A protein has these predicted regions:
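N-terminal helix-loop segment corresponding to the beta1-alpha1 unit
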Residues: 2-180, 184-190, 359, 363-379
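Terminal low-complexity tails and localization/encapsulation signals of metabolic enzymes
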Residues: 2-19, 224, 241-243, 318-379
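Glycine-rich beta-alpha junction loops
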Residues: 127-128, 201-206, 244-246, 252-257, ...
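Conserved Rossmann-fold dehydrogenase catalytic segment
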Residues: 129, 158-168, 189-205, 225-232, ...
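Oxidoreductase and adenylate-handling cofactor-binding alpha/beta cores
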Residues: 147, 173-194, 207, 211-219, ...
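Flexible glycine/proline-enriched surface loops and loop-helix/loop-strand junctions
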Residues: 159-169, 241-246, 349-352
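Aromatic-enriched alpha-helical interface/lid elements that frame and gate functional surfaces
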Residues: 231, 235-306, 310
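Conserved PLP cofactor-binding pocket of PLP-dependent enzymes
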Residues: 304-325
């Protein structure tokens, strides 16, 4: 893993020239803004006075990389006007307040679009802008629970597994917000008309299950976890423990890959067939017994260079040092902080790391000058 130099002037990224106002929050909003910033957008984060939303040193808040920060008190008489001054010069805005809060602060969609009719106003919430739960507090675990996605993950005989806040906040939230923002930006450039993008984690998390709803309707998926082909129910698509407590992920779905896997893992000829569903428990037990005979490192060597579709389950730090990811530069290190590099990859306009995580208010004077908003300048 190589260190990253903060330099993107010669390769500003595919979103160079796009200005984004991010009203500071936590979770999916900042991550969405980071995605845009990594791709070259000029993201200005509007922080409020006082302690930040995360109780960590700003230098470690990786989701604020490639951004600049201004300090604005939206509850002060001049605060809303300062933000609207930025809005006039922006193409995108991201906010993650509960429904109605931005309006009460004077920076809701109506106020912003009145100042900039071509603005794309992105709203990131868990429950959405309407519906019976819209005003309720919540977090990723609750949103994915209600959307039907959390219940798909885990052992059939235990509680659902919790995939950090990756499935809801970031996959069902941030990524859908970014898709919505960029689609609406395209429309605004074609028509001159902005609009509001209502991105809800429950909607995105539900949308991720589209294929499975088709399988459910076709009778090829059971509406309970841990018994299906892709949720750990199939012995050929599961995680097994090695003799030293390490784990291996097996994804040998196709018959030709399963044949190679069976040979390398040492399954006996009389083992149940790959898709002999009634005998899946027996097959799983046999595979588990084989994996229990060697360490993780030994099994990794056995499967290295094969098409058996078996990989070691790595921790975050282990993943950052894996030779394949190191060769691709999947992870990088900036100022001593290991972090994922921008993704995806672009052949002509690659994403870059141009600035360290923004410190609240540190760029107020610079942004006031660059964006032409003198009302922001510190007095």
């Amino acid at each position: 893993m190589k260190g990253q130099r903060m330099d993107g002037a010669t390769n500003p990224g595919p979103l160079a020239g796009v200005r984004v106002v991010e009203l500071a929050g936590i979770g999916p909003g900042p991550f969405a803004a980071m995605l845009l910033a990594d791709l070259g957008a000029d993201v200005v984060r509007v922080d409020r006075p006082g302690a930040g939303p995360l109780s960590i040193e700003p230098a470690y808040d990786v989701t604020n990389r490639n951004k600049r920060s201004v300090l604005v008190d939206l509850k002060s008489p001049e605060g809303p006007g300062q933000v609207l001054g930025l809005v006039e010069r922006a193409q995108l805005l991201i906010e993650g307040y509960r429904p109605g809060v931005a309006e009460r602060l004077g920076v809701g969609p109506d106020a912003c679009l009145a100042r900039n009719p071509a603005l794309v106003y992105g709203r990131m919430t868990g429950w959405g802008q309407d519906g019976p739960l819209a005003a309720r507090a919540g977090h990723d675990i609750g949103y994915t629970a209600l959307a039907g996605t959390l219940g798909m993950i885990g052992d059939p005989d235990g509680p659902p597994a919790i995939p950090a806040n990756l499935l809801g906040d970031y996959a069902g939230g941030s990524l859908y917000l970014v898709v919505g923002l960029l689609a609406a930006l395209h429309h605004a450039r074609e028509t001159g008309a902005g609009q509001v993008v209502d991105a809800a984690v429950v909607d995105g998390a539900a949308h991720l299950t589209s294929m499975l709803w088709g399988l459910l309707a076709a009778g090829r998926w059971q509406d309970r976890r841990g018994v299906n082909l892709l949720d750990g129910g199939a012995p050929c698509y599961a995680v097994y423990a090695a003799s030293d407590g390490g784990h291996l992920a097996v994804g040998a779905l196709e018959p030709q890959f399963y044949a190679e896997f069976s040979k390398l893992v040492g399954l006996e000829p009389d083992a149940p067939g790959q898709f002999d569903v009634p005998r899946w428990p027996e097959l799983r037990a046999r595979i588990a017994a084989r994996f229990a005979t060697r360490t993780l490192a030994e099994w990794t060597t056995v499967f290295d260079g094969t098409d058996a579709c078996v990989e070691p389950v790595l921790s975050m730090r282990e993943a950052a040092g894996h030779p394949h990811l190191a060769a691709r530069g999947t992870y990088t290190q900036v100022d001593g902080v290991t972090q994922p590099a921008p993704a995806p990859r672009f052949s002509a306009t690659p994403g870059t790391l141009r600035r360290p995580p923004a410190r609240p208010g540190a760029d107020t004077a610079e942004v006031a000058r660059d964006w032409g908003v003198p009302a922001l300048a510190p007095r």
